């Protein structure tokens, strides 16, 4: 079972639940905090105030409202917060555009991330990765992947290949709690997969299933187990109709 708090090298990673199934991620280093994809400001403000955490930065993976809807209110409460995100003219606030190959260091912390562009779910989608953690928004889910609202199947397949090449012990922090439904679909097309069946059994009574390890995604996630773009397209369409 994964705990509600992931501790590593004096950095805590804490899930903040929002809406029906969203995860907003708080990366805490001492009394400094970084928020990933704050779709709703209220639970974030409650957590920051309760723990007396100073919000240093906001990381945006993509433009959907359930990932950015709380940003303006957070700016009102923390006017000096630094915001990073993909290039998008629709954002109504100032932020630093980051692209593939960029690296960011959050001021006042030791937190550093590299940027990878992952078009598919949306064309502007990016992910943030360091040696041990991946914040992937709606590109990769536990045992699943994001729906294609803008990108092509080939674009999404190539985006997932980028993620697949990361270290197997990378912890994967996605934007939604879809794991159990995703496992049901995975079992419908890969019923004899021992690791997948074990994952299903292990998570039956677990409420928060994130983070997962990239290694277990490589073993059980049908969208990372395909051999080419055409296979990905076929399975993605089957999932859309599941």
Predicted regions and their residues:
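Catalytic core of the metallo-beta-lactamase
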Residues: 1-56, 95-185
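Accessory terminal helices/loops
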Residues: 2, 161-171, 178-242
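Active-site metal-binding motif and surrounding structural segment of the metallo-beta-lactamase
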Residues: 41-85
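Glycine/proline-rich, flexible active-site/cofactor-binding loop segments
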Residues: 62, 90-93
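Glycine-/small-residue-rich active-site loops that bind phosphorylated ligands and cofactors
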Residues: 66, 90, 148
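Short loop/edge segments at beta-strand edges and connector loops
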Residues: 85-87, 99-100
């Amino acid at each position: 079972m994964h705990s509600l708090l992931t501790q590593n090298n004096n950095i805590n990673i804490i899930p903040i639940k929002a809406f029906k199934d969203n995860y907003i991620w708080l990366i805490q280093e001492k009394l400094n905090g970084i928020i990933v994809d704050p779709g709703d400001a209220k639970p974030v403000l409650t957590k920051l105030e309760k723990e007396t955490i100073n919000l240093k930065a906001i990381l945006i993976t993509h433009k959907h409202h359930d990932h950015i809807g709380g940003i303006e209110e957070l700016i009102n409460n923390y006017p000096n917060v630094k915001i990073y995100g993909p290039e998008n003219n629709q954002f109504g606030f100032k932020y630093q555009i980051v692209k593939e190959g960029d690296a960011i260091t959050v001021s006042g912390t030791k937190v550093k991330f590299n940027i990878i562009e992952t078009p598919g779910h949306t064309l502007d989608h990016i992910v943030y990765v360091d040696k041990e953690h991946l914040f992937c928004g709606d590109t990769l889910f536990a045992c699943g992947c994001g729906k294609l609202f803008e990108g092509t199947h080939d674009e999404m397949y190539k985006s997932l290949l980028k993620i697949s090449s990361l270290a197997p012990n990378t912890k994967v922090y996605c934007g939604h709690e879809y794991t159990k439904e995703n496992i049901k679909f995975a079992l419908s097309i890969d019923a004899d997969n021992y690791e997948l069946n074990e994952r299903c059994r292990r998570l039956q009574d677990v409420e928060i299933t994130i983070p997962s390890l990239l290694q277990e995604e490589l073993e059980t996630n049908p969208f990372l187990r395909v051999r080419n773009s055409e296979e990905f397209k076929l399975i993605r369409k089957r999932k859309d109709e599941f």
